[in-house]
UniProtKB/Swiss-Prot annotation:
Stored InterPro entries: G_TrmE (IPR031168), GTP-bd (IPR006073), GTP-bd_TrmE_N (IPR018948), GTPase_MnmE (IPR004520), MnmE_dom2 (IPR027368), MnmE_helical (IPR025867), P-loop_NTPase (IPR027417), Small_GTP-bd (IPR005225)
GO annotation, cellular component aspect: cytosol
Primary localization: cytoplasm
Any GO BP annotation: tRNA wobble uridine modification
Binding-site list for K(+): 232, 251, 253, 256
Protein's organism: Lactococcus lactis subsp. cremoris (strain SK11)
Cofactor: K(+)
Pfam families the record matches: MMR_HSR1 (PF01926), MnmE_helical (PF12631), TrmE_N (PF10396)
Name of the protein in its database record: tRNA modification GTPase MnmE
Lineage summary: Bacteria, Bacillati, Bacillota, Bacilli, Lactobacillales
Family: Belongs to the TRAFAC class TrmE-Era-EngA-EngB-Septin-like GTPase superfamily. TrmE GTPase family.
Length: 455
């Protein structure tokens, strides 16, 4: 266990700035209680029990600033393993900023982004993977993304990585003993075959973990989804239904959407970054033409394409062009306006399609099911499974797996065990970067700088 390190006392507003019922100003450090007491009138905070909430007032000398509730949590049973004080104030920018400035004038330092979580990491409260999951939980756009983050915060990924690293370390230790003390008869010899069996087992464990990466990354980051189609086929109506609110202008006038509209929607637990593109057509309108070019770019960059066709009209040359343009993408063809008589010839469409009415919100559940089928083979989230979702973690597991494969190839070619040790050690070190056991200081600083202030 890492011993708590000595730091100065930091302060920051931990709730979003703006109007609200309450706001929280947080202190952490050796002098947290002393600094809070210097601006607080109520019970003596040095004498109250830990993990209690205490009523009082904040004063600037004799001037009342706010009526507050003050939470006192003593080390080491806190998030940072330091003394923590949280001042619950009335929401609003003026009051919270004034209280923060009072704390800073009385000895606290303004916290850097993510510094509270960084202290939790440095003091051994959480490891690096758990620290990153804190931000993933804050940024989660769906319940399934939040579930993955909570499991990682609880240590599911860390436990798996630590177990694999421990097994690798034991194998490396046995190799070292054989190299350094070959004359000892009572030490089991690690033969090439024995090491190959062990590294093959480690390789399988990492392969299994890596197989969750696609699902995890989608749930964490979302699917970039382009809604395409010629003008006035119902793209904006579809966007509004998926968002469950009116974000795009819906009219009968072609060219109403003159740019690219981007919003996030929760579709069955999958975050979709929906891009409602300008209708792709020839136009003399300069602004609309720019929107059309951006639409084509969005199509090229999309993870998923929703191609909207007007089922109440016959297919046009532009419809056929879009069908051809998107044929190699992860595409769902939507025959919209099924509330009107159908005139579209379905024989002109290759592959599956779904009939919907975006105007009346009919059959959109089938779109959700199709997305699930395309990207998750029908199972979005495996129960109790450890899932890789962070791009940094995925990259490190890929590199660790590559090192193991090189070790296995060397063993298969008959290379000495001591030469193979280099690749196995590299695998062990790479996995250690996930939890922070082997992460360089520069990486740790860079990761925590991405956190929000007050966390």
């Amino acid at each position: 266990m890492t011993l708590t390190q000595e730091f100065d006392t930091i302060a920051a507003i931990s709730t979003p700035l703006g109007e609200g019922a309450i706001a929280i100003v947080r202190l952490s450090g050796t002098d947290a209680l002393k600094i809070a007491q210097s601006v607080y009138k109520g019970k003596n905070l040095a004498q109250v029990a830990s993990h209690t909430i205490n009523y009082g007032h904040i004063f600037e000398e004799e001037r009342l600033v706010d009526e507050v509730m003050v939470s006192v949590m003593r080390a080491p049973k806190t998030f940072t393993r330091e003394d923590i004080v949280e001042i619950n104030t009335h929401g609003g920018i003026a009051v919270t900023q004034e209280i923060l400035q009072l704390l800073l004038r009385n000895g606290a330092r303004l916290a850097e982004p993510g510094e509270f979580t960084k202290r939790a990491f440095l003091n051994g409260r959480i490891d690096l993977a758990q620290a990153e999951s804190v931000m993933d939980l804050i940024r989660a756009k769906t319940d399934k993304a939040a579930n993955i983050a909570v499991k990682q915060l609880d240590g599911s990924l860390s436990k798996m990585i630590n177990n694999i690293r421990q097994d690798i370390l034991e194998s490396l230790a046995q190799v070292e003993v054989n190299i350094d003390y070959p004359e000892y008869d009572d030490v089991e010899t690690m033969t090439s075959q024995m090491l190959l069996e062990k590294t093959a087992h480690f390789e399988q464990l990492l392969e299994n973990l890596l197989s969750t990466a696609k699902r995890g990354k989608i749930l964490r980051e979302g699917l970039k989804t382009a809604i395409i189609g010629r003008p006035n086929v119902g793209k904006s109506s579809l966007l509004n239904q998926l968002l469950r609110e009116e974000k795009a202008i819906v009219t009968d006038i072609a060219g109403t959407t003159r740019d690219v509209i981007t919003e996030f929607a929760n579709i069955g637990g999958v975050p979709l970054e929906l891009v409602d593109t300008a209708g792709i057509r020839e136009t003399d309108d300069l602004v609309e033409a720019i929107g059309v070019e951006r639409s084509k770019k969005a199509l090229a960059e999309a993870d998923l394409v929703l191609l909207v066709l007007d089922a109440s009209l016959e297919l046009t040359d532009k419809d056929l062009e879009l069908l051809e343009l998107s044929k190699n993408a992860n595409r769902i063809v939507l025959l919209n306006k099924t509330d009107l008589p159908e005139k579209l010839d379905i024989n002109q469409i290759s592959g599956d399609f779904i009939r919907i009415s975006a105007l009346k919100n009919e059959n959109l559940s089938a779109v959700e099911e199709k997305i699930n089928q395309i990207f998750f083979a029908g199972e979005i989230e495996a129960k109790d499974a450890t899932v890789l979702s962070n791009a940094r973690h995925i990259s490190l597991v890929e590199e660790a797996l590559k090192a193991l494969k090189e070790a296995n190839n060397g063993l298969a070619l008959g290379l000495p065990v001591d030469l193979i040790q280099v690749d196995v050690t590299r695998c062990w070190q790479l996995l250690g970067e996930i939890t922070g056991e082997a992460a360089p200081d520069e990486l740790i600083t860079q990761l925590f700088s991405q956190f929000c202030l007050g966390k």
